[in-house]
């Protein structure tokens, strides 16, 4: 039960996350670098947690600060707006991706970790390792932004460290042991339409368009293999659904090592995120509810899977 006492709320929230005896104290000693007695004085409420300590605990356990200060989801929730800065888009985009990669990669293995995505565009976790497809998403955003001079796709030079962090972003999903993808049935068509438009106004050359087309065929092959196996190369389970209705946006949730993160994709490559528990539960429930409109094509649903990827290759071939 939340009170008007932020310190008491923090203690209660920590005990909800780590209910086993001794587990919470050990975590606090490791995170705050303080002794056992100092930890127990704080847990008894004799000494309040400092703001810096609260922030460290919040990040470690995925406890939202609004919960600590007693705000409810109905009145307020805190979001992190991850918007690429047009003054230095490459560095800004790199920092956003690196933040997620570092956060997930530094966590201990969690066999109960899960991720779910309902997507109307191909998810970043699937396409970012393909350099031209990753470059196209960034190019589209930069061209749309009036503050950035971006004249053609070929002229856009992506820094090597950004290319590498994009691949690391895809690789970090090896830490997620169960993944649900629910795809809009227009997921490839949307991308093809965008590429075709930029090619029609001569911002993408015919030669480059063919190279992008080859990457799309490769991606389709990878996704079909993923659907057939129902698991990644690391052995993590993947369920892929194709929706019979279209989605307005791309939503995702991640639950790993007591970190509950919700993401809403905006402005092509950007997202807003929150660690608010109630928003996480609501978003997860919403994403899972979309399965009732969808067909499972991983492991089972062989005929539907064959038909879906046949259609995607026909769409790609028309580029």
Q: Which residues are covered by each model-predicted region?
A:
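Short secondary-structure junctions and interdomain/linker hinges
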Residues: 17, 21, 104-107, 111, ...
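Basic, Lys/Arg-rich alpha-helical nucleic-acid-recognition elements, primarily the DNA-binding modules
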Residues: 1-84
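Generic detection of long, well-ordered alpha-helical segments
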Residues: 4, 18, 90, 206-213
